[in-house]
Protein backbone atom coordinates (compact mmCIF):
# COMPACT_ATOMS: atom_id res chain seq x y z
CA UNK A 1 0.00 0.00 0.00
CA UNK A 2 1.18 3.51 -0.76
CA UNK A 3 -0.23 5.17 2.33
CA UNK A 4 -2.43 7.39 0.16
CA UNK A 5 -6.16 7.09 0.50
CA UNK A 6 -9.53 8.07 -0.89
CA UNK A 7 -12.99 7.10 0.21
CA UNK A 8 -14.00 3.78 -1.24
CA UNK A 9 -17.34 3.12 -2.86
CA UNK A 10 -18.37 -0.51 -2.95
CA UNK A 11 -21.61 -2.36 -3.36
CA UNK A 12 -20.66 -4.57 -0.44
CA UNK A 13 -21.44 -3.56 3.13
CA UNK A 14 -18.77 -2.03 5.37
CA UNK A 15 -17.46 -5.29 6.88
CA UNK A 16 -17.57 -7.14 3.56
CA UNK A 17 -15.64 -4.33 1.91
CA UNK A 18 -12.81 -4.73 4.36
CA UNK A 19 -12.90 -8.49 3.99
CA UNK A 20 -11.95 -7.86 0.37
CA UNK A 21 -9.27 -5.46 1.53
CA UNK A 22 -7.76 -8.08 3.81
CA UNK A 23 -7.59 -10.67 1.05
CA UNK A 24 -6.24 -8.40 -1.68
CA UNK A 25 -4.21 -5.92 0.31
CA UNK A 26 -6.39 -3.05 -0.88
CA UNK A 27 -10.02 -2.00 -0.92
CA UNK A 28 -11.64 -1.50 -4.31
CA UNK A 29 -14.96 -0.56 -5.79
CA UNK A 30 -16.58 0.90 -8.93
CA UNK A 31 -15.13 4.33 -8.26
CA UNK A 32 -11.63 2.87 -8.24
CA UNK A 33 -12.15 1.83 -11.86
CA UNK A 34 -13.24 5.35 -12.79
CA UNK A 35 -10.19 6.75 -11.04
CA UNK A 36 -7.93 4.47 -13.05
CA UNK A 37 -9.21 6.23 -16.15
CA UNK A 38 -8.33 9.50 -14.47
CA UNK A 39 -4.77 8.37 -13.79
CA UNK A 40 -3.80 9.23 -17.36
CA UNK A 41 -4.55 12.83 -16.49
CA UNK A 42 -2.75 12.64 -13.19
CA UNK A 43 0.17 10.97 -15.01
CA UNK A 44 2.20 10.47 -11.89
CA UNK A 45 5.09 8.14 -12.51
CA UNK A 46 6.09 5.53 -9.98
CA UNK A 47 8.94 7.80 -8.93
CA UNK A 48 6.39 10.40 -7.85
CA UNK A 49 7.31 12.91 -10.63
CA UNK A 50 5.59 13.87 -13.84
CA UNK A 51 6.90 14.50 -17.30
CA UNK A 52 5.25 17.90 -17.70
CA UNK A 53 3.37 20.42 -15.62
CA UNK A 54 0.20 20.11 -17.66
CA UNK A 55 -0.03 16.42 -16.92
CA UNK A 56 -0.12 16.99 -13.16
CA UNK A 57 -3.61 16.84 -11.80
CA UNK A 58 -4.13 16.79 -8.03
CA UNK A 59 -6.09 13.72 -7.14
CA UNK A 60 -8.57 15.64 -5.01
CA UNK A 61 -10.55 16.55 -8.12
CA UNK A 62 -13.41 14.11 -8.41
CA UNK A 63 -13.37 11.45 -11.11
CA UNK A 64 -16.20 12.83 -13.29
CA UNK A 65 -14.14 16.01 -13.69
CA UNK A 66 -10.85 14.24 -14.24
CA UNK A 67 -10.26 14.99 -17.88
CA UNK A 68 -7.43 16.79 -19.56
CA UNK A 69 -9.66 19.55 -20.91
CA UNK A 70 -10.70 20.61 -17.41
CA UNK A 71 -7.10 20.72 -16.22
CA UNK A 72 -5.98 22.49 -19.37
CA UNK A 73 -8.74 25.12 -19.30
CA UNK A 74 -8.18 25.85 -15.64
CA UNK A 75 -4.43 26.21 -15.92
CA UNK A 76 -4.00 27.62 -19.41
CA UNK A 77 -3.23 31.24 -20.11
CA UNK A 78 -3.52 32.60 -16.57
CA UNK A 79 -0.59 30.79 -15.02
CA UNK A 80 -2.89 29.18 -12.47
CA UNK A 81 -3.70 25.56 -11.99
CA UNK A 82 -7.13 24.08 -11.35
CA UNK A 83 -6.83 24.52 -7.59
CA UNK A 84 -7.04 28.14 -6.39
CA UNK A 85 -4.91 29.47 -3.58
CA UNK A 86 -6.75 30.10 -0.32
CA UNK A 87 -6.16 33.84 -0.68
CA UNK A 88 -7.90 33.88 -4.05
CA UNK A 89 -10.99 32.32 -2.51
CA UNK A 90 -10.98 34.69 0.46
CA UNK A 91 -10.52 37.75 -1.74
CA UNK A 92 -13.57 36.72 -3.77
CA UNK A 93 -15.83 36.82 -0.70
CA UNK A 94 -17.32 40.22 0.26
CA UNK A 95 -15.62 41.52 3.39
CA UNK A 96 -18.91 41.94 5.24
CA UNK A 97 -19.31 38.16 5.23
CA UNK A 98 -16.56 37.97 7.84
CA UNK A 99 -18.23 40.50 10.15
CA UNK A 100 -20.63 39.08 12.75
CA UNK A 101 -23.67 41.13 13.70
CA UNK A 102 -24.23 40.39 17.39
CA UNK A 103 -27.82 41.59 17.33
CA UNK A 104 -28.62 39.37 14.34
CA UNK A 105 -26.91 36.41 15.98
CA UNK A 106 -28.85 36.91 19.22
CA UNK A 107 -32.08 37.09 17.25
CA UNK A 108 -31.52 33.65 15.76
CA UNK A 109 -30.43 32.26 19.12
CA UNK A 110 -33.56 33.61 20.82
CA UNK A 111 -35.84 32.13 18.16
CA UNK A 112 -34.26 28.68 18.28
CA UNK A 113 -34.04 28.56 22.07
CA UNK A 114 -37.65 29.71 22.29
CA UNK A 115 -38.75 26.94 19.95
CA UNK A 116 -36.83 24.38 21.99
CA UNK A 117 -38.39 25.62 25.22
CA UNK A 118 -41.82 25.32 23.63
CA UNK A 119 -41.11 21.78 22.47
CA UNK A 120 -39.91 20.63 25.89
CA UNK A 121 -42.24 22.72 28.02
CA UNK A 122 -45.49 22.71 26.06
CA UNK A 123 -45.52 19.91 23.52
CA UNK A 124 -43.77 17.14 25.46
CA UNK A 125 -46.42 16.93 28.24
CA UNK A 126 -49.02 16.48 25.51
CA UNK A 127 -47.03 13.53 24.18
CA UNK A 128 -47.30 11.83 27.56
CA UNK A 129 -51.07 12.26 27.46
CA UNK A 130 -51.31 11.31 23.79
CA UNK A 131 -48.47 8.88 22.87
CA UNK A 132 -49.61 8.81 19.25
CA UNK A 133 -48.00 12.26 18.95
CA UNK A 134 -44.53 10.79 19.55
CA UNK A 135 -43.74 10.08 15.85
CA UNK A 136 -44.36 13.78 15.19
CA UNK A 137 -42.87 15.20 18.37
CA UNK A 138 -39.55 13.34 18.30
CA UNK A 139 -38.34 14.34 14.81
CA UNK A 140 -39.74 17.87 15.15
CA UNK A 141 -38.01 18.48 18.47
CA UNK A 142 -34.87 16.73 17.25
CA UNK A 143 -34.79 19.16 14.32
CA UNK A 144 -35.14 22.14 16.66
CA UNK A 145 -32.29 20.72 18.73
CA UNK A 146 -30.22 20.55 15.55
CA UNK A 147 -31.08 24.19 14.80
CA UNK A 148 -29.76 25.14 18.25
CA UNK A 149 -26.63 23.13 17.59
CA UNK A 150 -25.90 25.27 14.53
CA UNK A 151 -26.19 28.42 16.65
CA UNK A 152 -23.71 26.96 19.14
CA UNK A 153 -21.56 25.90 16.20
CA UNK A 154 -21.18 29.58 15.28
CA UNK A 155 -20.21 30.28 18.89
CA UNK A 156 -17.55 27.59 18.78
CA UNK A 157 -16.01 29.15 15.68
CA UNK A 158 -16.16 32.63 17.18
CA UNK A 159 -18.44 33.81 14.38
CA UNK A 160 -21.47 34.43 16.62
CA UNK A 161 -19.98 37.68 17.89
CA UNK A 162 -16.64 39.32 18.55
CA UNK A 163 -17.24 38.91 22.29
CA UNK A 164 -15.59 35.68 23.47
CA UNK A 165 -17.53 35.66 26.73
CA UNK A 166 -20.85 35.98 24.92
CA UNK A 167 -19.84 33.20 22.54
CA UNK A 168 -19.05 30.96 25.51
CA UNK A 169 -22.34 31.70 27.30
CA UNK A 170 -24.56 31.20 24.25
CA UNK A 171 -22.53 28.18 23.20
CA UNK A 172 -23.12 26.47 26.54
CA UNK A 173 -26.80 27.46 26.65
CA UNK A 174 -27.43 26.01 23.19
CA UNK A 175 -25.23 22.93 23.60
CA UNK A 176 -26.05 21.75 27.12
CA UNK A 177 -29.62 20.68 26.18
CA UNK A 178 -28.04 18.55 23.44
CA UNK A 179 -25.54 16.92 25.83
CA UNK A 180 -22.67 18.32 23.77
CA UNK A 181 -19.80 19.68 25.93
CA UNK A 182 -19.29 23.05 24.28
CA UNK A 183 -15.60 23.78 24.76
CA UNK A 184 -14.27 20.25 24.09
CA UNK A 185 -16.46 19.94 21.01
CA UNK A 186 -15.30 23.36 19.77
CA UNK A 187 -11.70 22.20 20.22
CA UNK A 188 -12.08 18.92 18.30
CA UNK A 189 -14.22 20.60 15.65
CA UNK A 190 -11.51 23.14 14.97
CA UNK A 191 -9.12 20.25 14.31
CA UNK A 192 -11.70 18.86 11.87
CA UNK A 193 -11.63 22.15 9.97
CA UNK A 194 -7.88 22.53 10.22
CA UNK A 195 -7.23 19.05 8.79
CA UNK A 196 -10.35 18.31 6.76
CA UNK A 197 -9.97 15.05 4.82
CA UNK A 198 -6.55 14.31 6.28
CA UNK A 199 -6.45 10.55 6.69
CA UNK A 200 -5.09 10.56 10.25
CA UNK A 201 -5.50 14.11 11.62
CA UNK A 202 -9.12 14.86 10.66
CA UNK A 203 -11.52 14.65 13.59
CA UNK A 204 -15.20 13.68 13.53
CA UNK A 205 -16.24 10.78 11.27
CA UNK A 206 -13.23 8.41 11.32
CA UNK A 207 -11.42 7.64 8.08
CA UNK A 208 -10.99 3.88 8.26
CA UNK A 209 -8.03 2.07 6.80
CA UNK A 210 -8.32 -1.73 6.98
CA UNK A 211 -5.80 -1.70 9.83
CA UNK A 212 -7.75 0.85 11.85
CA UNK A 213 -11.01 -0.98 11.26
CA UNK A 214 -9.53 -4.26 12.45
CA UNK A 215 -8.17 -2.51 15.56
CA UNK A 216 -11.58 -1.08 16.44
CA UNK A 217 -13.50 -2.77 19.24
CA UNK A 218 -16.01 -5.24 17.69
CA UNK A 219 -18.83 -3.88 19.86
CA UNK A 220 -18.13 -0.36 18.62
CA UNK A 221 -18.09 -1.63 15.04
CA UNK A 222 -21.45 -3.30 15.63
CA UNK A 223 -23.08 -0.32 17.34
CA UNK A 224 -21.61 2.62 15.44
CA UNK A 225 -19.95 1.61 12.16
CA UNK A 226 -21.49 -1.37 10.45
CA UNK A 227 -25.25 -0.91 10.68
CA UNK A 228 -27.99 1.66 10.15
CA UNK A 229 -28.44 2.34 13.84
CA UNK A 230 -24.96 3.83 13.92
CA UNK A 231 -26.58 6.98 12.53
CA UNK A 232 -28.38 7.35 15.87
CA UNK A 233 -25.70 6.05 18.24
CA UNK A 234 -22.52 7.21 16.55
CA UNK A 235 -22.44 10.80 17.79
CA UNK A 236 -23.06 10.15 21.50
CA UNK A 237 -20.49 7.36 21.29
CA UNK A 238 -18.02 9.73 19.65
CA UNK A 239 -18.43 12.23 22.48
CA UNK A 240 -18.30 9.69 25.31
CA UNK A 241 -15.74 7.02 24.46
CA UNK A 242 -12.09 7.40 25.39
CA UNK A 243 -10.21 4.18 24.55
CA UNK A 244 -8.18 4.20 21.32
CA UNK A 245 -9.78 0.98 20.15
CA UNK A 246 -13.11 2.82 19.92
CA UNK A 247 -11.74 4.84 16.97
CA UNK A 248 -12.93 8.11 18.51
CA UNK A 249 -10.81 11.20 19.05
CA UNK A 250 -11.08 10.78 22.82
CA UNK A 251 -13.80 11.53 25.35
CA UNK A 252 -15.25 15.04 25.28
CA UNK A 253 -16.55 14.59 28.84
CA UNK A 254 -13.34 13.45 30.59
CA UNK A 255 -10.79 16.19 31.43
CA UNK A 256 -7.96 13.63 31.36
CA UNK A 257 -8.86 12.55 27.83
CA UNK A 258 -6.24 11.95 25.16
CA UNK A 259 -8.23 14.49 23.12
CA UNK A 260 -6.32 17.16 25.02
CA UNK A 261 -2.84 15.61 24.87
CA UNK A 262 -1.60 18.40 22.59
CA UNK A 263 -4.05 21.06 23.72
CA UNK A 264 -3.38 24.06 25.96
CA UNK A 265 -3.64 23.10 29.63
CA UNK A 266 -6.78 25.15 30.22
CA UNK A 267 -8.72 22.93 27.79
CA UNK A 268 -8.93 20.25 30.48
CA UNK A 269 -10.44 22.71 32.96
CA UNK A 270 -12.83 23.96 30.29
CA UNK A 271 -13.80 20.35 29.60
CA UNK A 272 -14.84 19.90 33.23
CA UNK A 273 -17.00 23.03 33.08
CA UNK A 274 -18.70 22.08 29.81
CA UNK A 275 -19.28 18.49 30.91
CA UNK A 276 -20.85 19.74 34.15
CA UNK A 277 -23.39 21.83 32.22
CA UNK A 278 -24.41 18.76 30.21
CA UNK A 279 -24.68 16.53 33.27
CA UNK A 280 -26.68 19.24 35.02
CA UNK A 281 -29.15 19.52 32.16
CA UNK A 282 -29.47 15.75 31.94
CA UNK A 283 -30.32 15.72 35.64
CA UNK A 284 -33.00 18.33 35.02
CA UNK A 285 -34.60 16.15 32.36
CA UNK A 286 -34.92 13.30 34.86
CA UNK A 287 -36.25 15.62 37.54
CA UNK A 288 -38.84 17.08 35.17
CA UNK A 289 -40.29 13.73 34.07
CA UNK A 290 -42.44 11.32 36.08
CA UNK A 291 -40.86 8.04 35.04
CA UNK A 292 -38.16 6.51 32.91
CA UNK A 293 -40.74 5.73 30.24
CA UNK A 294 -41.89 9.35 30.16
CA UNK A 295 -38.26 10.53 30.07
CA UNK A 296 -37.64 8.30 27.07
CA UNK A 297 -40.63 9.80 25.29
CA UNK A 298 -40.04 13.41 26.24
CA UNK A 299 -36.24 13.62 25.96
CA UNK A 300 -34.51 10.47 24.70
CA UNK A 301 -36.57 10.10 21.52
CA UNK A 302 -35.95 13.66 20.27
CA UNK A 303 -32.32 13.42 21.39
CA UNK A 304 -31.79 10.39 19.16
CA UNK A 305 -33.42 12.27 16.28
CA UNK A 306 -31.02 15.16 16.90
CA UNK A 307 -28.12 12.69 16.89
CA UNK A 308 -29.34 11.40 13.55
CA UNK A 309 -29.44 14.93 12.14
CA UNK A 310 -25.88 15.58 13.25
CA UNK A 311 -24.66 12.30 11.82
CA UNK A 312 -26.57 12.67 8.55
CA UNK A 313 -25.63 16.25 7.78
CA UNK A 314 -21.95 15.91 8.66
CA UNK A 315 -21.67 12.55 6.90
CA UNK A 316 -23.25 13.80 3.69
CA UNK A 317 -21.12 16.94 3.75
CA UNK A 318 -17.92 14.90 3.63
CA UNK A 319 -18.76 11.58 1.97
CA UNK A 320 -19.72 10.56 -1.54
CA UNK A 321 -18.70 7.93 -4.06
CA UNK A 322 -15.80 10.08 -5.29
CA UNK A 323 -14.60 11.60 -2.01
CA UNK A 324 -10.85 11.68 -1.47
CA UNK A 325 -8.73 11.67 1.68
CA UNK A 326 -5.03 12.44 1.99
CA UNK A 327 -2.08 11.04 3.87
CA UNK A 328 0.47 13.27 5.60
CA UNK A 329 2.79 13.69 2.62
CA UNK A 330 0.12 14.75 0.15
CA UNK A 331 -2.49 16.64 2.18
CA UNK A 332 -3.01 20.32 1.52
CA UNK A 333 -5.65 22.57 3.11
CA UNK A 334 -7.46 23.71 -0.03
CA UNK A 335 -7.44 20.22 -1.54
CA UNK A 336 -9.02 18.80 1.59
CA UNK A 337 -11.59 21.57 1.66
CA UNK A 338 -12.57 20.93 -1.95
CA UNK A 339 -13.90 17.53 -0.92
CA UNK A 340 -16.66 19.24 1.05
CA UNK A 341 -20.08 19.00 -0.59
CA UNK A 342 -22.92 21.52 -0.60
CA UNK A 343 -26.13 19.50 -0.43
CA UNK A 344 -29.60 20.88 -1.05
CA UNK A 345 -32.02 19.09 1.27
CA UNK A 346 -35.06 21.07 0.13
CA UNK A 347 -38.46 21.19 1.86
CA UNK A 348 -37.34 24.27 3.82
CA UNK A 349 -34.67 22.28 5.68
CA UNK A 350 -31.75 24.34 4.36
CA UNK A 351 -33.31 27.58 5.54
CA UNK A 352 -34.56 26.22 8.89
CA UNK A 353 -31.15 24.79 9.75
CA UNK A 354 -29.29 27.98 8.86
CA UNK A 355 -27.80 26.76 5.57
CA UNK A 356 -25.42 24.38 7.29
CA UNK A 357 -26.39 21.90 4.56
CA UNK A 358 -26.19 23.81 1.28
CA UNK A 359 -23.46 26.38 2.07
CA UNK A 360 -20.82 24.18 3.66
CA UNK A 361 -17.96 24.49 1.18
CA UNK A 362 -17.44 28.18 1.92
CA UNK A 363 -17.81 27.51 5.64
CA UNK A 364 -15.17 24.79 5.58
CA UNK A 365 -12.68 27.02 3.84
CA UNK A 366 -13.41 29.97 6.16
CA UNK A 367 -15.08 29.07 9.42
CA UNK A 368 -15.09 32.65 10.75
CA UNK A 369 -18.29 33.63 8.90
CA UNK A 370 -21.67 33.66 10.71
CA UNK A 371 -24.33 31.41 9.22
CA UNK A 372 -26.46 34.29 7.91
CA UNK A 373 -23.59 35.37 5.63
CA UNK A 374 -23.01 31.97 4.08
CA UNK A 375 -25.35 32.31 1.10
CA UNK A 376 -23.50 35.37 -0.15
CA UNK A 377 -20.12 33.76 0.57
CA UNK A 378 -21.15 30.57 -1.20
CA UNK A 379 -22.09 32.49 -4.34
CA UNK A 380 -18.63 34.07 -4.35
CA UNK A 381 -16.74 30.83 -3.75
CA UNK A 382 -18.86 29.05 -6.32
CA UNK A 383 -17.93 31.72 -8.86
CA UNK A 384 -14.26 30.80 -8.44
CA UNK A 385 -14.59 27.03 -8.21
CA UNK A 386 -17.38 26.13 -10.62
CA UNK A 387 -15.69 27.34 -13.85
CA UNK A 388 -12.73 25.13 -12.93
CA UNK A 389 -14.91 22.11 -12.29
CA UNK A 390 -14.04 22.07 -8.60
CA UNK A 391 -17.35 22.92 -6.94
CA UNK A 392 -19.35 20.02 -5.49
CA UNK A 393 -23.08 20.55 -5.12
CA UNK A 394 -25.68 17.79 -4.92
CA UNK A 395 -29.47 17.76 -4.97
CA UNK A 396 -30.11 15.60 -1.90
CA UNK A 397 -33.83 15.94 -1.30
CA UNK A 398 -33.78 12.20 -0.64
CA UNK A 399 -31.46 12.94 2.29
CA UNK A 400 -32.98 10.36 4.64
CA UNK A 401 -32.61 7.47 2.21
CA UNK A 402 -29.31 8.87 0.92
CA UNK A 403 -27.77 8.87 4.39
CA UNK A 404 -28.44 5.19 4.99
CA UNK A 405 -27.68 4.09 1.43
CA UNK A 406 -24.38 5.98 1.23
CA UNK A 407 -23.29 4.81 4.67
CA UNK A 408 -23.99 1.21 3.69
CA UNK A 409 -22.15 1.58 0.38
CA UNK A 410 -19.23 3.82 1.33
CA UNK A 411 -19.00 3.55 5.10
CA UNK A 412 -15.76 5.11 6.30
CA UNK A 413 -13.46 3.01 4.10
CA UNK A 414 -10.38 4.35 2.36
CA UNK A 415 -8.48 3.01 -0.65
CA UNK A 416 -4.73 3.16 -1.07
CA UNK A 417 -3.83 1.78 -4.46
CA UNK A 418 -3.83 4.72 -6.89
CA UNK A 419 -0.88 6.88 -8.01
CA UNK A 420 -1.01 10.41 -6.64
CA UNK A 421 0.42 13.80 -7.40
CA UNK A 422 3.03 14.74 -4.82
CA UNK A 423 2.55 17.68 -2.48
CA UNK A 424 5.19 19.64 -4.41
CA UNK A 425 3.35 19.05 -7.67
CA UNK A 426 0.06 20.05 -6.07
CA UNK A 427 1.64 23.24 -4.78
CA UNK A 428 3.02 23.92 -8.25
CA UNK A 429 -0.49 23.89 -9.62
CA UNK A 430 -1.69 26.25 -6.91
CA UNK A 431 1.14 28.75 -7.39
CA UNK A 432 1.39 28.37 -11.15
CA UNK A 433 5.04 27.35 -10.96
CA UNK A 434 6.51 24.43 -12.86
CA UNK A 435 7.32 21.30 -10.89
CA UNK A 436 9.93 20.13 -13.39
Placement of each model-derived feature along the sequence:
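Juxtamembrane helix-capping/reentrant segments at transmembrane boundaries
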Residues: 160-179, 202-221, 327-346
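Non-catalytic, topology-defining segments of multipass membrane proteins
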Residues: 14-144, 151, 175-301, 308, ...
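Alpha-helix C-capping/helix-to-loop hinge sites
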Residues: 158, 173-177, 364-365, 384
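Membrane-interfacial segments at transmembrane helix termini in multi-pass membrane proteins
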Residues: 307, 311-352, 391-396
